[in-house]
């Protein structure tokens, strides 16, 4: 196995290819990315055997922006028999037992790309999972006692008779099948954008810290808040929110008593002096470098402690623009000797944008 399969949003294959190539090169691993436009995935082929596994261990998955999953895979297995797809898969894994401890495997995920064309294939994958899991367990696999240090087996179907066979490391992969969290839209939320912030909180904030980082003693500012999709996520966690927008906020949010509507320009708004702001969130539709400059100002001036914001990416050179924006923020914080934690991700509920999280340390 000398390849990586990486999933992404359809249309972002080139950005992911550039990112994985850059990360691999930084580790002294060379190869090339196979890109099919709008396919929803990238195959990165290493020149040397064993280097794909090295990348799957050494590249910190949470530091990849455009990848939804990181899997070591085989060559594409084609022409699988409709009558028996399982036997060739079992046989392939048997051939890998000398280099892959399959007794450390904890689960099997049967997946496909997240595209409109693959929706019918996704239904097949769900049905195929049960008999395949049973067959793998008969081999003594999928029984790892320590799940965190184990591996997950992956079958990535590109067609009903063609698949990549592989594995990922449980301590360095996305925790959801296909890298997609299944979130339900809350009926009382003012807009569907609420799912973007919910996913961001679930992704960036450890579950055991959420209650201490979001509660009734915390204050937040939501720039460009109207009609209140992001404000809703903060209020439901007890946070008091200064909702900044010339537009109207949802009546249901006013009724909570946990917001103050500030009908102002998000770029000109200044935090109230009578309380310290814990969180700044921002989903304004604006040039990404202008947003990066605004967020930098809030952090450098100490107006907030943590922030989650989106950078819109309508331009062609999206990965380059992301790099420039993040570097712009990092340079300003480093210049002031401010310690910080930064993560960026193209979340499932993001479209032509990425979500960035920064915490001052």
UniProtKB/Swiss-Prot annotation:
<keyword id="KW-0489">Methyltransferase</keyword>
<dbReference type="GO" id="GO:0032259">
    <property type="term" value="P:methylation"/>
</dbReference>
<dbReference type="Pfam" id="PF18125">
    <property type="entry name" value="RlmM_FDX"/>
</dbReference>
<dbReference type="InterPro" id="IPR040739">
    <property type="entry name" value="RlmM_FDX"/>
</dbReference>
<dbReference type="InterPro" id="IPR029063">
    <property type="entry name" value="SAM-dependent_MTases_sf"/>
</dbReference>
<dbReference type="InterPro" id="IPR011224">
    <property type="entry name" value="rRNA_MeTrfase_M"/>
</dbReference>
<dbReference type="InterPro" id="IPR002877">
    <property type="entry name" value="RNA_MeTrfase_FtsJ_dom"/>
</dbReference>
<comment type="similarity">
    <text>Belongs to the class I-like SAM-binding methyltransferase superfamily. RNA methyltransferase RlmE family. RlmM subfamily.</text>
</comment>
<keyword id="KW-0949">S-adenosyl-L-methionine</keyword>
<feature type="active site" description="Proton acceptor">
    <location>
        <position position="312"/>
    </location>
</feature>
<dbReference type="Pfam" id="PF01728">
    <property type="entry name" value="FtsJ"/>
</dbReference>
<feature type="binding site">
    <location>
        <begin position="226"/>
        <end position="229"/>
    </location>
    <ligand>
        <name>S-adenosyl-L-methionine</name>
    </ligand>
</feature>
<feature type="binding site">
    <location>
        <position position="193"/>
    </location>
    <ligand>
        <name>S-adenosyl-L-methionine</name>
    </ligand>
</feature>
<dbReference type="Pfam" id="PF21239">
    <property type="entry name" value="RLMM_N"/>
</dbReference>
<dbReference type="GO" id="GO:0005737">
    <property type="term" value="C:cytoplasm"/>
</dbReference>
<dbReference type="GO" id="GO:0006364">
    <property type="term" value="P:rRNA processing"/>
</dbReference>
<protein>
    <recommendedName>
        <fullName>Ribosomal RNA large subunit methyltransferase M</fullName>
        <ecNumber>2.1.1.186</ecNumber>
    </recommendedName>
</protein>
<dbReference type="GO" id="GO:0008757">
    <property type="term" value="F:S-adenosylmethionine-dependent methyltransferase activity"/>
</dbReference>
<feature type="binding site">
    <location>
        <position position="265"/>
    </location>
    <ligand>
        <name>S-adenosyl-L-methionine</name>
    </ligand>
</feature>
<comment type="function">
    <text>Catalyzes the 2'-O-methylation at nucleotide C2498 in 23S rRNA.</text>
</comment>
<keyword id="KW-0698">rRNA processing</keyword>
<keyword id="KW-0808">Transferase</keyword>
<comment type="subunit">
    <text>Monomer.</text>
</comment>
<keyword id="KW-0963">Cytoplasm</keyword>
<feature type="binding site">
    <location>
        <position position="245"/>
    </location>
    <ligand>
        <name>S-adenosyl-L-methionine</name>
    </ligand>
</feature>
<feature type="binding site">
    <location>
        <position position="283"/>
    </location>
    <ligand>
        <name>S-adenosyl-L-methionine</name>
    </ligand>
</feature>
<dbReference type="InterPro" id="IPR048646">
    <property type="entry name" value="RlmM_THUMP-like"/>
</dbReference>
């Amino acid at each position: 196995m000398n390849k990586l399969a990486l999933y992404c949003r359809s249309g972002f294959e080139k950005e992911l290819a550039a990112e994985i190539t850059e990360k691999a090169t930084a580790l002294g691993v060379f190869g090339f990315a196979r890109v099919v436009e709008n396919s929803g995935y990238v195959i990165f082929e290493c020149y040397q055997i064993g280097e794909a596994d090295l990348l799957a261990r050494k590249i910190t998955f949470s530091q990849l922006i455009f990848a939804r999953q990181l899997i070591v895979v085989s060559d594409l297995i084609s022409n699988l028999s409709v009558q028996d797809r399982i036997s060739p898969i079992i046989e392939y894994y048997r051939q890998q037992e000398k280099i892959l401890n399959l007794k450390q495997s904890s689960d099997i995920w049967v997946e496909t790309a997240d595209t409109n064309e693959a929706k019918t294939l996704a239904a097949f994958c769900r049905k195929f999972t049960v008999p395949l899991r049973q067959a793998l367990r008969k081999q003594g696999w999928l029984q790892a006692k320590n799940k965190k240090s184990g591996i997950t087996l992956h079958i990535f179907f590109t067609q009903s008779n063609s698949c990549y066979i592989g594995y990922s490391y449980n301590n360095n992969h996305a925790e959801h099948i296909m890298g997609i969290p299944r979130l339900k839209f809350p009926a009382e939320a003012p807009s569907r954008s609420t799912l973007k912030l919910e996913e961001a909180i679930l992704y960036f904030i450890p579950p055991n810290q959420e209650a201490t980082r979001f509660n009734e003693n915390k204050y937040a500012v939501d720039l460009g808040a109207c009609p209140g999709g992001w404000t809703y996520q903060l209020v439901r966690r007890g946070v008091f929110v200064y909702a900044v927008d010339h537009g109207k906020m949802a009546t249901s949010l006013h009724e909570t008593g946990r917001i103050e509507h500030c009908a102002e320009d998000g770029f000109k708004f200044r935090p109230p002096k009578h309380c310290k702001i814990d969180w700044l969130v921002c989903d304004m539709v604006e040039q990404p470098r202008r947003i990066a400059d605004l967020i930098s100002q809030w952090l450098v001036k100490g107006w907030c402690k943590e922030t989650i914001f989106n950078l819109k990416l309508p331009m062609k050179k999206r990965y380059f623009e992301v790099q420039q924006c993040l570097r712009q923020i990092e340079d300003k914080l480093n210049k002031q000797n401010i310690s910080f934690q930064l993560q960026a991700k193209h979340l499932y509920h993001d479209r032509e944008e990425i979500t960035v999280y920064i915490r001052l340390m």
